[in-house]
Structure formats: structure tokens, C-alpha cells
């Protein structure tokens, strides 16, 4: 019989406004900026086609399968308020398009090719709805929030961390000394910076050994369980696993991975190893702003956060709302809830386009890090709540008396804020008062308050692109 060759409009096949989404569909919300003259329906359908079964022309092998069963469908289009040339295209993908348990395959399909499409000026993936049928094919976080608290025996407050600075250039022994001083002063965790791997000035094995010594010494002296995020990120998966195995042999509680630069395949392998071997896994989001900072093109961080919860990690950096790195309060709390909670309702005011049911997938602790110090403690305690890690790098190591007093100042400030909150005080209104009261009996906190009182990072965002 032959077939009708030639180029055809995508919207004839892939724009289906009458489609009723299934419980098993993966749903995507794209912010689409089409080229002038391209109608919204055609642009939305093009996104659905190019990220599923479509190609630019009709091919005879289309007749050998059921396109209706496997194609993505653009089922709804809505304008973006305040933007003339933009709209949100909602696309539904049948579950059979995706390999089970593979974030790599999911992203290769949904965002792998379509972002370079000529008919679009810009394209941004704003949100994904992951159905329970797909969620259940992932292991998710190695342990989750409750198991982590049980391992650490720490309840009822946020956890405290510190990134060791300067991030590059210290010898392993001096690095270990800084770790010991911070943990001894009262922090729960210290952290390798994301770009500390295995450089000529400090090879990974030396760092692991000195940090392990620091952890066990601080534990013995304080009676608290301590940890240091040993960065296992490496140039090959085999080398990464070798570092994870060595960390486990040392008996440390937690390791770390840069999940975007390391890649989802490596991250999922590492998360599986951590679950099998009792290691917690801290995740750094290095490179995220390359993908998520532009509001018209790329991918929103809430999508990367969902992907991490599926791939596996017990902590992930999530912005601060109050520090030096960008993060709008409602939007940030939207993806913080997506990391921690089992069920999150659709709420467009917080950027959540779909109701997300994680069924029994464990939660991830959000990490607030970047330009924060003791005066931020009341706001951070109120915004992030107990299930979070508050991480002060310069805010610990920049203390005028040294690392250990810097750690003491942070711990005293945190305990004061938690106690005040538990007594029913309003942290938002009385925050400075609470810190000032605590500083009267903690000289370390008083010194920290004096040095950082005037520091603020409240710049207006300059990006309007």
C-alpha cells in the first residue's frame, strides 16, 4: 500500500487537548519560547514529539509499531502571566518509554535532544510528575532522614556542618586538624569542598586517613557521633568506588559525591553501595546553576532535586534563602518539601506544577550552605525546620579566635534558637534578641556576633533573561 511520505505538522499527531492523563504517565511542564511565527500548539507538539517517538519526517517504520501507544502528547497549553511570547506546555509520556531505575535514561528521553530544536528560541523544564509505578523502580536515598537520625543519635534540631576552607591548597594533616577543631567545638559534620578530589597538594588517601583520625578523636572527647563528608568523586566510576570502599574500611559514617559533574549513572551506583554498606551519602550540586539559573532555558532545580531523590542521596544542597547564593523563599521551600515529604500537593505559588506522591521512597535532608553566619541562625531554624543541615564554612572558620570557637558559637546559637522556638517564641521577630541573650553567657558567640553584625548579601538579582 505504501505510506504518505513527507514533512507533516507535529500538531496533527502530538497535540491532543482531549487526552486524559493516566496515573502511570510521567508528566512534564515545559516553559516554551517559540520562534516568531510558530504557533503555541505546534511548538508544544514539537516538544512532545522530539522528546518521544517523533522525527522530522514520516518514516515507513512508523507502520511497524503503535505510535499511539508510545508517543508523548502535549495535552494542555497555558500562557505565562506577564510574558507575551511564552507559555507552559504540559506533556504526558507513557511509562513504557523509560528504562526502570534509570534517571539517566529518563533525562536522555525528556531533555536529551529537544533543547536544541530550531523552532524554539528557548525551552525550560519547570517540573516533572513521577508516578508511583516509576518511583518504585528506584532505590532512592541510601538511608533517609529517620535512619540517619538513628545512626547519629541526634533528634529535635537541625544538624550543623562546616565546609573546610581554604577549599584548595591545605596539606592533608592541616586539613585533618581543621576537621578535628570544628567537630570538637560542637559541629556534627565537616565537609570536603566539591572540588577537593585528589590533587597534587593533597591525595585522597592521605586526606581520608587524617580526617578519620580527626573524627574518632572528636567523638571520643565529646561523646557525640561525628562525621566528615569525604568526597569520593573521581575521574572514573572504578576509582570512585575504590574511595568509597576505603572510607567504609576506615569506619567513617558518611561520604560525598558531586552528582551532576559525576553523572547520574555513577551517583546511582554509589548510592546502592552506600545502602548495602551502611554509609550515609552527602550530595553536592556543583554545576547546577549552569542548568537551572536562566529562567527561560534549561531546567529548574526542583527537577534536579526530584531526580536526586530517585537516584539516591541522604543530603543535598538546596540554597539558603538568606545567604550569598540565590534562592527565593517560597520556591526554595517548595523543592525542600519535595525532597523531604512523602506527598506534596500541587501549589503553583511555590512552583509545584504537579501533585507528587513519593509512596515509600525515603526523604533527603536539605543542606543550607553559602554565606551564612550566626545572625542568620534564627531565620534558618524557622525556614528549614529540624530536618535540615545548616552549613557554615566561613561562618565557622572565619571566627576571630579560630576554628573551635567558631564551631562553639554556631552550636550555642543553634541550641538557643531551638530552645526559644520550643518555648513558643517568634524566631522571625525576636531572632536578634535571642542571639544577643545567648551571647551574654558565650564569649565565643559574642565575638562572632561582633564581627558579622553588619554583613549582608541582600543584592537584587541582576539576571532578567
From Swiss-Prot:
Q: Which residues are in coiled coils?
A: none
The main place the protein resides is plastid
Site, as annotated: Transition state stabilizer: 324
Q: Which residues bind substrate?
A: 113, 163, 167, 285, 317, 369
Q: Which residues form the active site?
A: 165 (proton acceptor), 284 (proton acceptor)
Sites where N6,N6,N6-trimethyllysine occurs are at 4
Q: Which domain of life is it from?
A: Eukaryota
Spell out the InterPro entries in the cross-references: RuBisCO, RuBisCo_large_chain_AS, RuBisCO_lsu_C, RuBisCO_lsu_C_sf, RuBisCO_lsu_fd_N, RuBisCO_lsu_N_sf, RuBisCO_lsuI
Q: How is the cofactor bound?
A: Binds 1 Mg(2+) ion per subunit.
**The EC number(s) this enzyme carries:** 4.1.1.39
N6-carboxylysine PTM positions: 191
What are the annotated GO cellular component locations?
A: chloroplast
- Give the record's subunit note: Heterohexadecamer of 8 large chains and 8 small chains; disulfide-linked. The disulfide link is formed within the large subunit homodimers.
Family assignment from sequence similarity? Belongs to the RuBisCO large chain family. Type I subfamily.
Give the miscellaneous note. The basic functional RuBisCO is composed of a large chain homodimer in a 'head-to-tail' conformation. In form I RuBisCO this homodimer is arranged in a barrel-like tetramer with the small subunits forming a tetrameric 'cap' on each end of the 'barrel'.
Q: What is this protein called?
A: Ribulose bisphosphate carboxylase large chain
- Native organism: Dillenia indica
Question: Which gene name does the record give?
Answer: rbcL
Amino acid at each position: 500500500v505504501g505510506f504518505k511520505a513527507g514533512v507533516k505538522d507535529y500538531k496533527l499527531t502530538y497535540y491532543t487537548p482531549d487526552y486524559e492523563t493516566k496515573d502511570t504517565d510521567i508528566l512534564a511542564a515545559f516553559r516554551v519560547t517559540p520562534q516568531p511565527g510558530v504557533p503555541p500548539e505546534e511548538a508544544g507538539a514539537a516538544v512532545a514529539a522530539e522528546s518521544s517517538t517523533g522525527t522530522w519526517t514520516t518514516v515507513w517504520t512508523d507502520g511497524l509499531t503503535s505510535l499511539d501507544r508510545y508517543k508523548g502528547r502535549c495535552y494542555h497549553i497555558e500562557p505565562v502571566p506577564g510574558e507575551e511570547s511564552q507559555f507552559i506546555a504540559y506533556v504526558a509520556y507513557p511509562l513504557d518509554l523509560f528504562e526502570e531505575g534509570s534517571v539517566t535514561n529518563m533525562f536522555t528521553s525528556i531533555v536529551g535532544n529537544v533543547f536544541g530544536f530550531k523552532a524554539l528560541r528557548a525551552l525550560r523544564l519547570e517540573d516533572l510528575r513521577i508516578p508511583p509505578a516509576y518511583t518504585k523502580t528506584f532505590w532512592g536515598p541510601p538511608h533517609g532522614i529517620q535512619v540517619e537520625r538513628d545512626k547519629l543519635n541526634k533528634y529535635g534540631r537541625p544538624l550543623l556542618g562546616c565546609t573546610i576552607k581554604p577549599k584548595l591548597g591545605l596539606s592533608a594533616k592541616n586539613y585533618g586538624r581543621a576537621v578535628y577543631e570544628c567537630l570538637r567545638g560542637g559541629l556534627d559534620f565537616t565537609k570536603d569542598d566539591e572540588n577537593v578530589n585528589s590533587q597534587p597538594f593533597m591525595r585522597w588517601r592521605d586526606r581520608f586517613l587524617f580526617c578519620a583520625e580527626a573524627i574518632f578523636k572528636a567523638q571520643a572527647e565529646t561523646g557525640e557521633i561525628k562525621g566528615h563528608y569525604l568526597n569520593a568523586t573521581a575521574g572514573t566510576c572504578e576509582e570512585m568506588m575504590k574511595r568509597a570502599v576505603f572510607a567504609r574500611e576506615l569506619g567513617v559514617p558518611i561520604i560525598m559525591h558531586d552528582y551532576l559533574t559525576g553523572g547520574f549513572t555513577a551517583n546511582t551506583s554509589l548510592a546502592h553501595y552506600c545502602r548495602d554498606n551502611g554509609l550515609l551519602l552527602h550530595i553536592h550540586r556543583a554545576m547546577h546553576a549552569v542548568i537551572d539559573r536562566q529562567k527561560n532555558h534549561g531546567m529548574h532545580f526542583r527537577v534536579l532535586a526530584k531526580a536526586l531523590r530517585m537516584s539516591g542521596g541522604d543530603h543535598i544542597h538546596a540554597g539558603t534563602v538568606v545567604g550569598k547564593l540565590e534562592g527565593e523563599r517560597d520556591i526554595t521551600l517548595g523543592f525542600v518539601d519535595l525532597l523531604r515529604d512523602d506527598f506534596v500537593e500541587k501549589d503553583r505559588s511555590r512552583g509545584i506544577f504537579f501533585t507528587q506522591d513519593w509512596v515509600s521512597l525515603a526523604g533527603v535532608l536539605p543542606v543550607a550552605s553559602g554565606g551564612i553566619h550566626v545572625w542568620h541562625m534564627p531565620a534558618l531554624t524557622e525556614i528549614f525546620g529540624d530536618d535540615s543541615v545548616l552549613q557554615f564554612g566561613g561562618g565557622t572558620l572565619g571566627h576571630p579566635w579560630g576554628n573551635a570557637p567558631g564551631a562553639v558559637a554556631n552550636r550555642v546559637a543553634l541550641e538557643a534558637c531551638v530552645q526559644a522556638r520550643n518555648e513558643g517564641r517568634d524566631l522571625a521577630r525576636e531572632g536578634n534578641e535571642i542571639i544577643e541573650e545567648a551571647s551574654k553567657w558565650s564569649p565565643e558567640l559574642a565575638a562572632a556576633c561582633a564581627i558579622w553584625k553588619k554583613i549582608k548579601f541582600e543584592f537584587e538579582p541582576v539576571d532578567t533573561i
